[in-house]
Amino acid sequence: MKADVVIVGGGLMGFSTALHLALRGSRCVVLEKDSPGRHASGVNAGGLRQLNRHPAEIPLAVAAAETWHRIRELVDSDCDARFPGQVRIAENAADMDKLEQRAAQVQSLGYRHEELIGRDELYRLVPALAPHCVGGLICRGDGYARPFHALTAFRNKACSLGVHYQDSTRVERVEQSGGDWRVQSQRGEFQAPVLVNCAGAWANTIASMLGEPVPLTPGAPMMMVTERLPHFIAPVVGAASRKLSFKQMHNGTLLIGGAHLARLDLQHESTEMNWRKLAVSARTVLALFPQLIDVRIVRTWAGVEAFMPDHIPVIGPSGTAPGVYHAFGFSAHGFQLSPVVGRILAELILDGRSGLPVAPFSIQRFAA
C-alpha cells in the first residue's frame, strides 16, 4: 500500500499526527501491532497538566492546554475533559520552599500559569485534606480527560478524513528504497516517503532498525480505582515530596496513581501488580485523606510506557534517516501533550519547521 506518510503506533501520538497531517491533505497509514490504545494511551491517568512540567516542555504544555480547552473543535468530541485545576500540596516548610523555588523558576521563564497559594486557599479548594498541610502550587486551568474517550475521538476524526488504520500489524522490517520507506509487516508492505515512529515502549525497536538506538526504558505505571463515593474534592491533587496523582471522577470513583511501577514482561506484553508499591501509594493517600481508610479498591491496572533518561520525550526528525520522524519516550506524562505533538510533527513534515521549540527533544542528544 502506498501513502504519503506511514505512522508506526496506533496510540494518541500516532493518531494525533495522522489527524493533523490529514487536515492538510496528506494520505496517511497508521499501523498498530495490537489494538488502539492497548498500552499507554488508553490506560493512563488522563492528566491535563501544565503544572510542574520540565522547563523544555512548558511551551508545548501551554499550547496543548489551549487546544484541550476547545478540543471539540479538533476532534468533534469533548473527550470528557474537565478543568477543576491541579494542585501540588506542601506538607511542611521544606515542601513550601521547594514550591516557591519552582514558582520563581517558571516566572523567570515568562510564564504565570503556576500560582503559589497559602494554607487558607488550599483548604478552601480541598477542605477534606488532612490538617497538617501548609500551602501549595496550583495551575487553575489544568484538569483531566478520559484517555480511551480521547483516543477514540482522535482515531475516529482521523479516519473520517481518510486516514487508513490497521491494527494487529506488527512492523518487522524497515528499509529505504529510492525515495520511499518500505515498511514490512506480517500483513503486507506499506510504502511512503515519510515514516513516523510513534511506537511507544517499542519505539527503540524501530529506531534501531534505522541505525539510531536510544536508551529507552519500558515501564508500567500502576493505577488504582476505588468504589464510588459522594463527591468531596474537585482539583487533581499531587504532592511536593510524595509520588501521587489523585482525582475524583465525575462518577464518584477515586483514581489513584503516582508512577509506582508494576513488574513488566515486555516480551510477552504482560504486567504483574507490585502490591508493596501499591500499598505505598495507598498509604500516601491516607496520609492526606485519612477519612478514606475504609474505602475499597475495586480495580488496579498498569499501562506500558517509554521512559527516557532525562524524562523528556524524543520529538522531531531522525538524525540518520532522511524522511523519518520520531515522537516517543514521554515518560508517563505525554497524554496532555498529544494534540500539540501531532501538530508539531505535521509542521516539521510539511513545512520543515515548527512554530514551537523542539530542539531540546532531538534524538541526537543520545547520539554516541
Language model region names:
Residues A3-V29:
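N-terminal Rossmann-like FAD-binding beta1-loop-alpha1 element of flavoenzymes
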Residues A22-G42:
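Glycine-rich FAD pyrophosphate-binding loop
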Residues R38, E189-A234:
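Central helical "cap/lid" subdomain
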Residues G46-L125, K243, T284-V285:
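Dinucleotide-binding Rossmann-like beta1-alpha1 core, especially the glycine-rich loop
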Residues S77-R88, H113-R119, Y123-L161, A262-Q267, ...:
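Helix-loop-beta segment of a Rossmann-like dinucleotide-binding subdomain
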Residues L137-P193:
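Helical element adjacent to the flavin cofactor pocket in flavoenzyme catalytic cores
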Residues R228-G323:
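Active-site lid/adjacent beta-loop-alpha segment flanking the redox-cofactor pocket in flavoenzymes
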Residues A287-A368:
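C-terminal catalytic lobe of FAD-dependent flavoproteins
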